């Protein structure tokens, strides 16, 4: 994917109006440890250390859109119970329009409780309602949809078969949206996809596609057969089948098929990955990307989501970083302070050790390279803070730098040992270190630990300072003197 195209999309995200229609629920997580078996039965005993509640179902789709910066409205029906009020409160805190979330007396708001120990889900407990909506509440929802859908750029339908998406509600969504050429994207459930007729694109996973088509997917031919069956049955123009470690396959009504390979990642939890796919596909389409590019974007985001435990969101910074890794050119490694702060925070959350060093690096030489390679070996990521031209002039004098900041930045970013480069205008890198919070701060051997800018800050949160000796006789000053000496002799 083109990184600049993705960055441009996310810059426009705050203008995109997204409507999410579907089943809402709460996802409860009980995090703990287990090291014994119950004397009452052959089951593990979990000591709960932490509990948290997250928006689930269509709520996780909304959360993903919010994380991208989109404007979000949610239309659904919940109960007049504790879980229902908790959902409304959570949405309100995030600025979500909850006007079309109706509460039905006697209806049970869904809550899924997952018990997790040692990064493994041990058991899930579901408390939910699967009854279709009553006639009165169904009509209220339909009336709102018919009156307001035209104000949105895209509609996302998140079906968990919990009763909100009745045939009448679905027909109202697709018919109203299609009259205004508003795309409708559906994450489907069940085996009867005819209820989604009129949608722009469905996004089943492989298992769901097998159930809907009756075709076991074992190879490329059976995959195509399953897609053809679903598309002809539903009268569908576009179908995106997610295939886990095999990526995604987009089938279009014009006969075009796009297979999108996955990026190899460690998978911790597939919970909510389909919600992430739906959200990114919608963001891309609403933002003007072609469907195939939107699918590629969704594929990148899904790869990030499955590396996290539980229902989770993916940020623009994480997606841009992942896209940049696909095309690891020097441009993709040069980041401003704000974007890099988000990237580094995400890397720290994964337990990765971030190393930071800084300097002018005017006239790159072998001593620099060996120093930077040694710094990179101290952790998982090496961030280089690079003095701007103005900063170099204040430190080195009016004749420096010899190489301007743009060229220096690209030269440094071209080194494999450097993961990201960030220019700073100040005389010292203290503000940049404060923003990035690296665990390891590196300087050359001509420093003492006490003389390293940022030492106290890094050590205050458990980090450390490392000093790496310079290579004797290798310096920018020596190079300049040698050039002047040789060219002076020639003249």
UniProtKB/Swiss-Prot annotation:
E.C. numbers: 2.7.1.167, 2.7.7.70
GO terms under cellular component: cytosol
Keyword presence, Kinase: yes
Alphabetical keyword list: ATP-binding, Carbohydrate metabolism, Kinase, Multifunctional enzyme, Nucleotide-binding, Nucleotidyltransferase, Transferase
Region (Cytidylyltransferase): 356-491
Pfam families found in the cross-reference section: CTP_transf_like (PF01467), PfkB (PF00294)
GO molecular-function terms, A-Z: ATP binding; heptose 7-phosphate kinase activity; heptose-1-phosphate adenylyltransferase activity; phosphotransferase activity, alcohol group as acceptor
GO biological process per UniProt: ADP-L-glycero-beta-D-manno-heptose biosynthetic process
Subunit structure: Homodimer.
Family per record: In the N-terminal section; belongs to the carbohydrate kinase PfkB family. In the C-terminal section; belongs to the cytidylyltransferase family.
Name of the featured protein: Bifunctional protein HldE
Source organism per UniProt: Trichlorobacter lovleyi (strain ATCC BAA-1151 / DSM 17278 / SZ) (Geobacter lovleyi)
């Amino acid at each position: 994917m083109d990184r600049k195209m993705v960055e441009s999309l996310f810059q426009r995200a705050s203008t995109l109006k997204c409507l999410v229609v579907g089943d809402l629920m709460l996802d409860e997580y009980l995090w703990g440890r287990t090291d014994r078996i119950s004397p009452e039965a052959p089951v593990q005993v979990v000591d709960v250390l932490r509990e948290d509640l997250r928006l689930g179902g269509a709520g996780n789709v909304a959360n993903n859109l919010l994380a991208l910066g989109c404007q979000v409205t949610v239309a659904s029906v919940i109960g007049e119970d504790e879980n229902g009020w908790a959902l409304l409160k959570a949405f309100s805190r995030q600025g979500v329009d909850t006007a079309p979330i109706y509460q039905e007396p006697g209806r049970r708001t869904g809550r899924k409780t997952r018990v997790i120990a040692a990064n493994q889900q041990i058991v899930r407990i579901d408390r939910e309602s699967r009854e279709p909506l009553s006639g009165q509440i169904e009509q209220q929802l339909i009336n709102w949809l018919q009156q307001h859908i035209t104000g949105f750029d895209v509609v996302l339908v998140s079906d968990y078969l919990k009763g909100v998406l009745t045939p009448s509600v679905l027909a109202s969504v697709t018919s109203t949206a299609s009259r205004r050429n508003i795309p409708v994207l559906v994450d489907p459930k069940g085996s009867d996809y005819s209820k989604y007729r009129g949608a722009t694109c469905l996004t089943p996973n492989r298992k769901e596609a097998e159930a809907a088509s009756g075709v076991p997917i074992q190879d490329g031919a059976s995959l195509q057969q399953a897609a053809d069956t679903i598309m002809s049955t539903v009268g569908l123009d576009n179908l995106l089948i997610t295939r886990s470690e095999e990526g995604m396959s987009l089938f279009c009504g014009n006969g075009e098929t796009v297979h999108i390979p996955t990026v190899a990642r460690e998978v911790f939890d597939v919970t909510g990955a389909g919600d992430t796919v739906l959200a990114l596909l919608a963001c891309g389409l609403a933002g003007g990307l072609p469907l195939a590019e939107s699918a590629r974007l969704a594929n990148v985001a899904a790869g990030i989501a499955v590396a996290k435990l539980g229902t989770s969101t993916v940020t623009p910074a994480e997606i841009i970083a992942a896209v940049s890794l696909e095309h690891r050119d020097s441009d993709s490694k040069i980041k401003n302070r704000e974007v890099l702060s988000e990237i580094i925070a995400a890397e720290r959350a994964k337990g990765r050790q971030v190393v930071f060093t800084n300097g002018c690096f005017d006239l790159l030489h072998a001593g620099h390279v060996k120093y930077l390679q040694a710094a990179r070996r101290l952790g998982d990521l090496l961030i280089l803070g690079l003095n701007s031209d103005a900063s170099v002039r204040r430190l080195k004098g009016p004749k420096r730098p010899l190489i301007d900041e743009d060229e220096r930045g690209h030269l440094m970013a071209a080194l494999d040992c450097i993961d990201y480069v960030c220019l700073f205008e100040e005389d010292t890198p203290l503000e940049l270190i404060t923003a990035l919070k690296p665990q390891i701060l590196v300087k050359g051997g001509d420093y003492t630990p006490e003389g390293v800018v940022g030492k106290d800050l890094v050590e205050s949160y458990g980090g450390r300072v490392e000093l790496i000796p310079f290579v004797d006789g290798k310096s920018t000053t020596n190079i300049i003197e040698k050039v002047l000496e040789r060219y002076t002799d020639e003249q």
